[in-house]
């Protein structure tokens, strides 16, 4: 039980900006085991967003959507948005070359492509949030962060790590591969408790995952921390839009 709690705390510290403080730096093995808790972190983010949405009942939907999106970004510290920005720049600037793409991803500067992609993704999220809130469907909000963070263990389990060294490789090398399929099956299966909306969100998540993974493999031969972050952001966006349509 103590080890499970520590894994959750490691996952929360890594994926969110919640005030989680550990007594010591996690080991690579602990970072690897923490991947089991990524779906739960998504659930917790979703619960916070739902609670915030309910507390803002009566607020105009556009303002409510803007406040919720701001909270959403703050909860993750824009961690995944940073990965999306890096991947967008690298995918265009890399011109199809693996080494050039990886080099651009390491550049901390953001180019115009990154800015445009971030604006478009945030605009789509905002619009979808406003639509869902206007339809009285705030209860569906947890599906987006939940399924997006459930896709991370699936990515690490099925896709080699493309860049040697770093935290990403340590996580990939210490994945609890025997336990992950059960956790993923349970996480994806529980999404069906949301009925047809859950089924739609799950199908969108899996189809987008399959397509993005194929692009990662074709360009890089694997995944990186940036592409994993992009997967989270694009999955959240796609699920929200699908539910709002």
Curated annotation (Swiss-Prot):
It is an enzyme of class 2 (transferase). GO terms for molecular function: adenosylcobinamide-GDP ribazoletransferase activity; cobalamin 5'-phosphate synthase activity. It is found in: Cell inner membrane. InterPro entries: CobS. Keywords: Cell inner membrane, Cell membrane, Cobalamin biosynthesis, Magnesium, Membrane, Transferase, Transmembrane, Transmembrane helix. It catalyses: alpha-ribazole + adenosylcob(III)inamide-GDP = adenosylcob(III)alamin + GMP + H(+); alpha-ribazole 5'-phosphate + adenosylcob(III)inamide-GDP = adenosylcob(III)alamin 5'-phosphate + GMP + H(+). The keyword Cell membrane applies. Pathway: Cofactor biosynthesis; adenosylcobalamin biosynthesis; adenosylcobalamin from cob(II)yrinate a,c-diamide: step 7/7. Its cofactor is Mg(2+). Coiled coil: none annotated. The chain crosses the membrane at residues 31-51, 61-81, 113-133, 138-158, 192-212. One of its GO terms (cellular component) is plasma membrane. The keyword Cell inner membrane applies. Its main location: membrane. Its EC number is 2.7.8.26. It is a multi-pass membrane protein. GO terms for biological process: cobalamin biosynthetic process. HAMAP family: CobS (MF_00719). Joins adenosylcobinamide-GDP and alpha-ribazole to generate adenosylcobalamin (Ado-cobalamin). Also synthesizes adenosylcobalamin 5'-phosphate from adenosylcobinamide-GDP and alpha-ribazole 5'-phosphate. Belongs to the CobS family. This is Adenosylcobinamide-GDP ribazoletransferase. It comes from Pseudomonas aeruginosa (strain UCBPP-PA14).
């Amino acid at each position: 039980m103590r080890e499970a709690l520590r894994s959750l705390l490691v996952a929360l510290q890594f994926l969110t900006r919640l005030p989680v403080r550990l007594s010591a730096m996690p080991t690579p093995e602990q970072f690897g085991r923490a991947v089991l808790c990524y779906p739960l972190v998504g659930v917790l983010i979703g619960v916070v967003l739902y609670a915030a949405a309910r507390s803002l009942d009566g607020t105009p939907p556009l303002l409510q959507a803007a406040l919720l999106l701001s909270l959403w970004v703050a909860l993750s510290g824009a961690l995944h948005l940073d990965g999306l920005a890096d991947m967008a720049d690298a995918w265009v600037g890399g011109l199809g070359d693996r080494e050039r793409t990886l080099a651009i991803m390491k550049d901390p500067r953001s180019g115009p492509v990154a800015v445009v992609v971030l604006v478009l993704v945030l605009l789509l999220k905002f619009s979808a949030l406003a639509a869902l809130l206007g339809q009285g469907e705030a209860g569906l909000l947890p599906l987006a962060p939940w399924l997006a963070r459930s896709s991370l263990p699936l990515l690490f389990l099925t896709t080699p790590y493309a860049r040697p060294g770093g935290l990403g490789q340590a996580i990939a090398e210490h994945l609890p591969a025997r336990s992950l399929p059960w956790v993923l099956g349970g996480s994806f299966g529980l999404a069906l408790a949301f009925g047809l909306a859950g089924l739609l969100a799950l199908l969108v998540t899996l189809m987008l995952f399959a397509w993005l993974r194929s692009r990662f493999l074709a360009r890089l031969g694997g995944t990186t921390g940036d592409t994993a972050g992009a997967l989270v952001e694009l999955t959240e966006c796609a699920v929200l839009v699908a539910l709002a349509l």
